[in-house]
């Protein structure tokens, strides 16, 4: 898979129907060990939390989310690949049941390990009305 395909797969696997959970083993396989995630996981989180993958799983499934279901919808993206390293800047929408979509932003750092692209880190935050991204994402 290319870096973009890895990121697409992350969004597919983190989305799930009410009464279930993400396919955590398949999702985990897309990340390096260790990995670092620095995220505002939910729109109401007061700050970004820095965590490892296992802590992220616990944080993501809090507040009865498995009963509601959850979907992440990818939007615009920019990718830069330099040798065995890649950066994918990705806009997406968080969709919770009975709530309007919440615009957000992920920055993925990927590395090619034994010929396979894996996510080494993710930073993420919500996009506020004042921060709506009017220009395409870029790292240059």
Locate the predicted segments by residue.
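Hydrophobic pocket/interface hotspot
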Residues: 10, 27, 35, 88, ...
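Terminus-proximal functional modules
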Residues: 6, 77-80, 91, 133-140
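Short beta-strand edge/turn micro-motifs at domain boundaries
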Residues: 87, 103-133
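Short beta-strand segments enriched in hydrophobic/aromatic residues
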Residues: 14, 31, 92-94, 123-124
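Surface-exposed, charged secondary-structure patches
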Residues: 2, 36-37, 41-100
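Non-catalytic cap/lid and distal C-terminal segments of serine-dependent acyl enzymes
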Residues: 56-57, 105, 132-139
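Residues that flank catalytic or metal-binding motifs in active/ligand-binding sites
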Residues: 33, 75, 106
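Short, low-complexity N-terminal intrinsically disordered segments enriched in polar/charged residues
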Residues: 1-30, 137-140
